[in-house]
Amino acid sequence: MKNIRNFSIIAHIDHGKSTLADRFIQYCGGLDLREMSTQVLDSMDIEKERGITIKAQTAALNYKARDGQVYQLNLIDTPGHVDFSYEVSRSLSACEGALLVVDASQGVEAQTVANCYTAIDLGVEVVPVLNKIDLPAADPERVEQEIEDIIGIDAVGAVQCSAKSGIGVEDVLEEIVAKIPAPTGDENAPLQAVIVDSWFDNYVGVVMLIRVKNGTIKLKDKVRFMSTKAETQVEQLGVFTPKSVQKQELKAGEVGFLITGVKELGQAKVGDTVTLVANPATEPLPGFQEVQSQVFAGLYPVESHDYEALRDALEKLQLNDASLKFEPEVSQALGFGFRCGFLGLLHLEIVQERLEREFDMDLITTAPTVVYEVVLKNGEKIEVENPSKLPDIGSIETILEPIITATILVPQEYVGNVMTLCNQKRGVQVNMQYMGRQVMLTYDLPMNEVVMDFFDKLKSTSRGYASLDYHFKEFQPSDLIKLDIMVNGEKVDALSLIVHRQSAVHRGRELASKMRELIPRQMFDIAVQAAIGSQIIARENVKALRKNVLAKCYGGDITRKKKLLEKQKAGKRRMKQVGNVEIPQSAFLAILQVSDK
């Protein structure tokens, strides 16, 4: 056990974590050259394309160190994006150490800081590594100073390497052996193994990635999941070197995979503890929490007969992604569809893209919303995640909205722009810290302002230099109202929004004029109105297309012309009563593009 090292890599997007992992695998001979592809551990196409890591993967590598001993290095790959922070904390809790990989030309970014603090809170040893030192813009001294200023760990003499060209990779491996502690645990104690990740395989069912903390797990053992109390039998055990290698048993300190007869991902929850039925542990390992959806959106098939296909596709995605929640819902405007819950905006985009790419679906997505807590006058408390489900204004005592704490790292010259943006979004400044050339801003922001377009605006006001990390803080009361859009006198439920009273009139006007441009002209006038309750705050008209009925009258009497025009008017009036309006997909996306001021 003293020769085992469990570690993961913490890095911001694009700082070279997957490339470094590839180098480790190549250096330790985990795969031969013909099997090496770039980004071996990112197995989904979308992970490779966006260059992000979504699911955790592992590799168990045997490394012969300079002291002549062979060490087993278990690399647990972690996602770097805000939305997947729970997966990151699970990956980190399975390790004793973490490599903090920082791009030597770009320096420290917000997500690196957040994940690094998570690691320090979990008591994980953090080892700084500077990557990309072969770039002309690399400035290792400045970045070492930044790591010290911002994160507060000693970075002088941090290992320098370039994962792309392979310089210094061996030094990094030596550093892992030297700095990261060996796992502790008792092989003879009752079994406690934490589920770091789980995914669905078409042949064997659910594959769980586990880290054994105490005890030993063997083939054919009967095991129990402690949060769901489900019991099952061990069918296969083994490790990934990224290829899977079968083993007879896994002992305390080891990381590997476990396959049982479980078919549903919901039974093997990430962060849960596995123990033996025969000799169970008295209590589970700490840190398990149910994943909460933060952002909701409606997904509707463009063709209504694809509804069942969409349900199948969502169920298949859910097999691999337990944090995706969905339930059927009906909208008058869009027909049958699903209300889905996501971890964040990136998660929403990825699910949408996977549905379109892997399952060939054509989708309409409504504007993302967050969960509101509504206290009714009779004292009852309900959760509303869909604006069209908000009860009547008269019966509501207060509406509480979710507030997040955002940490923004930004170069000094863009601080003003970013602060202006946060104030526009109703943010409250909590803290501001100067660290070298960077400034760390902490703001409490309403979450529904963030899900709209905050991220894009943050990037554009700071020329792409600002980076953001956020976590949920609390629900707090706020002056919110529901804004309805009416087309031809009928409310379109899928276009309803919950907005703050201050920006309601402005939002209503903007939306109405946006809709006017997007709704195709019909043979009759269409009124597009924005309403708060029964009060109309904005109106736009989509002009009718009309035929020139006077074309055939050359000279002639005015009464003849009047008669034809009156006849046309009456016809248009009749059409307006029976006509209904098709609302195009682009109109639903218009909500996202409406600015606040």
From Swiss-Prot:
What is the organism of origin for this protein?
Answer: Neisseria meningitidis serogroup C (strain 053442)
- Entry membrane topology: Peripheral membrane protein
**Name by which UniProt lists this protein:** Elongation factor 4
**What Pfam families does UniProt report for this protein, alphabetically?**
EFG_C, GTP_EFTU, GTP_EFTU_D2, LepA_C
Keywords for the protein's UniProt record, in alphabetical order = Cell inner membrane, Cell membrane, GTP-binding, Hydrolase, Membrane, Nucleotide-binding, Protein biosynthesis
Spell out the PANTHER family in the cross-references.
TRANSLATION FACTOR GUF1 HOMOLOG, CHLOROPLASTIC, TRANSLATION FACTOR GUF1-RELATED
The reactions it catalyses are:
GTP + H2O = GDP + phosphate + H(+)
Biological-process GO terms, alphabetical: positive regulation of translation
